[in-house]
Design a protein with these regions (language model features):
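Acidic (Asp/Glu-rich) sequence patches and key acidic residues
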Residues: 1-123, 129-131
Length: 131
């Protein structure tokens, strides 16, 4: 099981406010919360997210289903993590074969934080895909 994170904003052309929008997918569930993201907590997440999870756990802990716990993080948290990921070597078969317990952030390289815009250009998604 992999890690999924998502961050996006939705603009309503009528009143300029955010509108609830849930897209059903096998891999993703999107939140209407602007410039925030949810990280699924599992043992592949590196120590940075682990510490963030413990620090924010009391106020931000949210359960989305029976066995998966997410923690809410800000866009700045995601940018800091992306900088950490960018300093690592590029993903390769060799990198992916490294022991995830010794090199946990290598696992994150298979899903690079990216920007996706819909056809109308009104919605922006920042998503790290499952592996």
């Amino acid at each position: 099981m992999g890690l999924d994170t998502y961050i996006f904003s939705v603009e309503n052309p009528k009143d300029g406010k955010e509108t609830p929008d849930v897209i059903h997918s096998a891999k993703f569930t999107y939140s209407p919360i602007k410039e925030e993201a949810y990280w699924r907590k599992n043992y592949f997440i590196n120590s940075y997210i682990g510490e963030l999870y413990e620090k924010k756990r009391k106020e931000d802990l949210t359960e989305f289903n029976f066995n998966t716990v997410y923690v809410k993080v800000t866009y700045d948290d995601i940018k800091k993590l992306k900088r950490k990921i960018n300093t690592l070597p590029h993903a390769s078969w060799e990198a992916n074969s490294l022991d995830p317990k010794k090199y946990p952030t290598i696992r994150l390289l298979r899903g690079v934080l990216r920007e996706i815009k819909d056809n109308a250009g009104k919605r922006t998604f920042y998503a790290m895909s499952n592996w």
